[in-house]
């Protein structure tokens, strides 16, 4: 009997230890997600990684370079945005990592990337059963780096995250630099009081690196079947930028959306409405205190209604309230926001920017009034 109890105890300890080892990943950087742990000198030839498992926690395939901040490529100095190391994916090269997740849960991946050659570059990101292509030829940040987000729904308890460079460049070493890969579990948006808009304050969204001052790009809907911004769709050719209070001016709460691509940068949400009933849509329009100056206009659409809210930006923060009252013409109403104009930062970097929207509310009203 004593031996049976001891065997049972050992079995329970073994099971519990496996549970701990396979616990779902927590929000934040993946293991060695910033690539600060690198290959041994014997596993490299110059900057090229020669062994598949040489970068701790990652598997590599193809021409992958381990880049140190300040390393030179021809006459260009390669800059690493966070920490001192990153990886560069050559033609058809990839890196991947397996992690434990909760099946059925929506997750968002955030990563930083930069192109290192003049050619347009794309990056394929995938999990076990989903994939998307992220274009990185347009630069939104003044530092040469941008952070991107991509969402997926976990199909099982373990998934493999893979970054793949599908490009065929003239120079085999050309390819995107990747740094700081993080994950965040997303929760389904809920209604707040009488507000019919879900996640109208944009507080639920992709992981934001605490030290990254350039925000996180959310790709167009055509690039992503699951939105990293719960409740919202990015229905445009360009991305929108997710900004945080720590580095930008945010009208309300801790997060907001910057429309950085003019009319090519739009977000929308479909809400339930009652036919022939009147509704009031209100929202904040401002600037992110990121040097985006000049006259701005945000266009808001709901049903057959439209309003254009102007805002004179000095690039130092601030906002005003916009309002649209409309009559519902169907049981479902699409609410859409876009920027009328294209804007660039005043630092002459050529970086795109735009107006910020926040605190979106939609409530039923008794009758049509201003």
Swiss-Prot record:
Keyword list (alphabetical) reads:
Cell wall, Glycoprotein, Secreted, Signal
Major location (coarse): secreted
> Which positions carry the signal peptide feature in this UniProt record?
1-22
Give the observed phenotype of the deletion mutant: No obvious phenotype.
The induction comment states: Induced by L-galactono-1,4-lactone (L-GalL), the terminal precursor for ascorbic acid (AsA) biosynthesis in the Smirnoff-Wheeler pathway.
Transmembrane segment boundaries: none
Q: Localized where?
A: Secreted, Cell wall
Q: Which GO terms describe its cellular component?
A: extracellular region; plant-type cell wall
Glycosylated residues, chain numbering: 124
Listed name of the protein = Protein DUF642 L-GALACTONO-1,4-LACTONE-RESPONSIVE GENE 1
Question: Which species expresses this protein natively?
Answer: Arabidopsis thaliana (Mouse-ear cress)
Organismal lineage: Eukaryota, Viridiplantae, Streptophyta, Embryophyta, Tracheophyta
Q: Which gene encodes it?
A: DGR1
